Amino acid sequence: MLTKFWNNLTTEEIAKLSRNTIIIVPFSAIEQHGSHLPINTDKIILDKIIDKFCEENIKSKDFVVLPNLCIGSSSEHDSFQGTLSVDSVNYINFCLNYLESVFSKKFQKFIFLNSHGGQISHLDILAKELKNKYKSSKIIKANYFLFKGYNKVISENELLHGYHGGEFETSLMLYLANDLVRKNKIKKNKLSPDFNNKKIIGFEKKIKLQWSTEDINKTGIIGNPLNANSQKGKEITNIATSTIKKMIKELKLL
């Protein structure tokens, strides 16, 4: 079996997979990413990282990748043109019904690999509900943008505050899908003064203020893409694929 993608397998081939085969479930989003990145940035980045990982591990029989569920819950970007979003309740219910068709079969081990920060809490609920019903299942929840090691490439400040169309994602797109980046639109970006103030209540504080993207920046960008480059994107991609490999190695032992 040289394909790693569920969609490219036959029903007989899937039936022959080991119950210990790790099922990678990609979650992304279609939402605005400012004027310099396409609306499918989250999907492109995750697909390309997974493609690279599969190429590096083509002979492995440890995992199979489900289709990327790319219509996510992106209500924080609803006021911007191009965003496609499902409300939280319907999104969780759809994902639950969709994944039951895999969980209800023989498979036991899953990696929820997510590229959209706005649905982290949704996937927490999803994993909790599935684990409650399928007690023997092992579920990893992994947000690729939170993997360790990126601080060797991107500044701590930009990693903390630049998570939507900033240096991190723009560098990845310059490496993974260079032709889709509107380079003439890349410019210095400033955040709302309320974003990182010294008060105890805030967008990123322990006591959180709920926000929509326009509360932080009218451009739709959170972060500063000005220092992005393809070399940084390559290094980030390598860290991501290496981390996925380590996750699979550890999950195999559970």
List the predicted regions and their residue ranges.
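Extended, histidine- and acidic-residue-enriched regions that form the cofactor-binding/catalytic faces
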Residues: 1-109, 117-254
